Regions:
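Active-site phosphate-binding/coordination module
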Residues: 40-127
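Substrate-recognition "cap/lid" segment bordering the active-site pocket of phosphatases
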Residues: 85, 91-111, 163-193
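Non-catalytic pre-domain segments flanking phosphatase-related domains
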Residues: 1-25, 29-33, 37-40, 44, ...
Length: 251
């Protein structure tokens, strides 16, 4: 596989009104913390996002695995378009779309996993309604062990899929991902007919990269991973903020 090139704002057209910007949150806008709850609101980041959104005529969206409630807690802004739970929740300035068809099964899976992982220290099980996330960043549990446990449960659910991320495993609807979220926004104003940029850092962002590539946009992974669909990369979170700073200087 071809190694991705370093992303730079110089690759973009001078008129940023032609662009639509999609941003992951954890590992992209924020450094990854030991627990999702440790991420706190940042006024400077909120102001920066709002300014870029205004420059883009509103064509900026957050594409995250977090729930909408959690994203609202962090960003304190209902004007920015948001996709939560890996595309199972979508909100633009006009409407909210939410996929909850499997929420009952998610609750049952959460109970089963809690029983099977009972006694395992530093494992956080997060039921997000349409999705279920198991965080084990601070645990000594073997990744293969927890992966096997969750696969055994999910394999009997044809409408659900197990997604592996950085020190997390997520059970989510098969029909929704970050790629479908980006496609949804690209069919609506003010994103329509623009060229997309998507910046993310994890395996969970690969569907988004693939979608953006098909639409002739710029797919950017934080960290240079050879096994990625992203065409470009940025070395770290700091470099993402540098790109945002440069966008603020654009016309």
């Amino acid at each position: 596989m071809k190694v991705a090139s370093v992303f730079t704002v110089k690759l973009l057209p001078k008129d940023i009104q032609q662009l639509a910007l999609f941003l992951d949150v954890d590992g992209t806008l924020y450094e990854i913390e030991n627990s999702p709850s440790l991420i706190k609101p940042c006024f400077k980041l909120q102001k920066k996002l709002q300014t870029i959104r205004n420059r883009l005529g509103g064509a900026l969206a957050l594409i995250s695995g977090r729930s909408l409630d959690d994203l609202d807690r962090i960003f304190e802004n209902d004007k920015i378009s948001v996709a939560g739970n890996h595309g199972a929740q979508l909100r633009d300035t006009l409407r909210l779309k939410e996929y909850q068809a499997e929420s009952g099964k998610i609750k049952g899976i959460a109970y089963k996993i809690s029983e099977l992982l009972n006694g395992k220290k530093n494992i956080e099980i997060e039921n997000k309604g349409s999705n279920l996330t198991v965080h084990f960043r601070n645990s000594t549990i073997d990744r293969k062990e927890i992966n096997k446990i969750m696969l055994e449960i999910v394999k009997y659910e044809p409408k659900l899929i197990l997604l592996e991320g950085k020190e997390v495993l997520e059970v989510k609807p098969l029909s929704h991902n970050k790629g479908t979220a980006i496609s949804y926004f690209m069919r609506t104003k003010p994103f329509i007919k623009r060229r997309p940029i998507f910046i993310g850092d994890d395996v969970t962002d690969e569907d988004g990269f693939e979608t953006v590539n098909k639409k002739g946009g710029w797919s950017v992974r934080v960290g240079n991973y050879k096994r990625s669909k992203a065409k470009f990369f940025l070395p770290n979170v700091k470099s993402v903020h540098e790109v945002m700073k440069q966008l603020l200087k654009s016309r």
